[in-house]
Amino acid sequence: MALALSACTPVAMPDLAAMMPAMRWDHRPEASDWTQATLTAVAARDDALAGKVPADIATFCPNYAKASLPERRAFWAGLLSAVAKYESSWNPAASGGGGRYLGIMQLSPRTAAQHGCDAQSAAALKDGAANLQCSVKVMAHAVGTDGVVAGNGRQGVGRDWMPLRKSKERAEIAAWTSSQSYCR
């Protein structure tokens, strides 16, 4: 609780969790930290993400072209949260491909190094927030290069994350992001 200086009366503090955009990982105890880390990383890459309108955005976020900057950032964070369902079931300690792919977004240390991520070791990539921050760098590079969210499934985010290469999973991800308040 804070005091309003002008009247010295108590003022309720806003519920920050209620102000966060919806993510598919909201059921996880780390949700608030992951969402904040992802939104911060997306804001740092507005040049390739929220500042652009990808050619196939209507499939994933129908109102994106008219959306505010915070809504656009929420879309990119929401997209990662939807892809993470398929990559790791939102498990930050997940390890796949014989230990080559790590964490919530199943990044390899090699990919992390190629993109100049702070998290490059196996241990660091198993930190959910660090993995997501790195994933934003990877995503920004791919989307910036291709000008699409997923294109034919092998472009944009689909370059690095297999769920977008599968039409059924790509459609489910798009249905989820499209239904969020920041995309309507």
Label for each model-derived stretch:
Residues 1-2:
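Sec-dependent signal peptide recognition
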Residues 8-58, 117-184:
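Non-catalytic cell-wall polysaccharide-engagement segments
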Residues 56-65, 71-91, 135:
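Short, functionally critical alpha-helical segments immediately adjacent to catalytic or ligand/cofactor-binding
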Residues 74, 99-102, 126:
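Residues at secondary-structure transition points
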Residues 85-90, 110-114, 138-141, 145:
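Amphipathic alpha-helical interaction surfaces
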Residues 93-98:
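Short, solvent-exposed loop/turn and secondary-structure capping segments
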Residues 99-118:
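Substrate-binding/active-site groove segments that recognize
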